[in-house]
Amino acid sequence: MTRRQLQCYQGQDEKNMISDMKKRFLNICLFFPVLFFTHYKPVLSGVYDWKQPATTATKNINTSVMFEGNAFEMEWLQMTANILIASDKKTTVTIPANEEHLYIVKKGTLNVWKADSSYSLSQGSILVLFPGDVLPIQNTQTNACEFFVMKYRSNPFPDSERAKNAGGSIIKNWNNVEFKPHDRGGVRTFLERPTAMLKRLEMHVTTLNAGLKSHAPHTHAAKEIIVMMEGDTEMLVGKKTFKGKEGSVYFLESNILHGITNVGTTPCTYFAIQFE
């Protein structure tokens, strides 16, 4: 039987199968460039200093990237320095459906509106915004408002039900968080709870007296970010030592040895953020 005769006997199902295989192959070829361009290198443990954004008259929010990459189960993690200029107009922030954003006010006052409530968030206040959140923000003060934004995507899909059951988006005003003094300084406990992207997000603020260590060098499974609000510190990270000041951010990967010391002459204050 000739090749032409064989083709005549080929069933319709077989033809459909070959057509499907061609379509799948084409989709794979189209998908590979997406994989290439969305691949991020791991964020390296160490210190990243505040990068003052250049302000422009055409933008209310001006941003510079401090670090960006992946971090184990975090497909993408980015920390930015931001300035919101004074304006009589609100700026609407929309969180993408596959991201969460964590705001920390570094300087000034950030006005936000959520549902039927309005908030004036002073230095040290935080926002945790979930996928799909939309809210207006504004700076009505004379000076610019500076704030950190940590954006992240987890490898598993967002769990909106988990976030809803945990209480939804988070707004915490610094002035409403109790300070509990201890022999090394004191602590403010902000939160510990799951989110849409994370099984656990824990945040507290440590005030550490001059010349003291917060803890002996230690490790833990959760990744940790230290955001310096004031003072001068030194952080042991693995076998290296890094120095941080106001606006610096330490990134600590899972299970890396670390320990922070206040090397200044006055108390230092910093956020400690663990997530997994």
Please state what every model-predicted region is.
Residues 95-111, 205-208, 219-234:
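Short, conserved beta-strand element in jelly-roll/cupin
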